[in-house]
Amino acid sequence: MNLKKYTDYALRVLIFTGLKSDQELANIKEIAEVYQISQEHLRKVVHELTKMELVVTIRGRNGGIKLAKPASEINIGLLIRQLENDFVLLECFDKGTNHCVISPGCTLKHVINKALVAFFKVLEEYTLEDLIKNEEELLALMGIEKV
């Protein structure tokens, strides 16, 4: 099972932004440089995070991005659920494309679904705050000095 790149990038934006102080703004250019990701991809991700009310953007020359709420209030499991809205792990999960002849009697779907529920249950135990607790290490890996 893989998360979409979009979800990965959203998590990276939130981690990067969460490492900034309340007065300090992140910007797409620096996030793109640190993670070596296209600025265009990041613009789309930031737009979605803004619609989800997880970040706010400030326009203008000194503008940028900051968290819209404390890192402790951004639940990782709920975020991933929202971004990964089509967890089709098996063909039989999607009634529109399911052509499996054993689907009506197969228990594999139930086993996989139970695992998926457990996956999200674990993710929902964590917030963005948990992901940035090792702040000094993350900043060093990104080549950023704390202001």
From Swiss-Prot:
GO cellular component: cytosol
InterPro entries per UniProt: Tscrpt_reg_Rrf2 (IPR000944), WH-like_DNA-bd_sf (IPR036388), WH_DNA-bd_sf (IPR036390)
HTH rrf2-type domain segment(s): 2-133
GO molecular function per UniProt: 2 iron, 2 sulfur cluster binding; DNA binding; DNA-binding transcription factor activity; metal ion binding
Swiss-Prot/TrEMBL keywords: 2Fe-2S, DNA-binding, Iron, Iron-sulfur, Metal-binding, Transcription, Transcription regulation
Keyword Chloroplast applies: no
Keyword Iron in annotation: yes
SUPFAM superfamilies on file: Winged helix' DNA-binding domain
Gene3D superfamilies: Winged helix-like DNA-binding domain superfamily/Winged helix DNA-binding domain
The record's free-text note on cofactor binding: Binds 1 [2Fe-2S] cluster per subunit.
Binding site for [2Fe-2S] cluster: 92, 100, 106
Segments of the chain annotated as binding DNA: 28-51
Cofactor: [2Fe-2S] cluster
Function noted in UniProt: Nitric oxide-responsive transcriptional regulator.
Protein's recorded name: HTH-type transcriptional regulator NsrR
Source species taxonomy: Bacteria, Bacillati, Bacillota, Bacilli, Bacillales
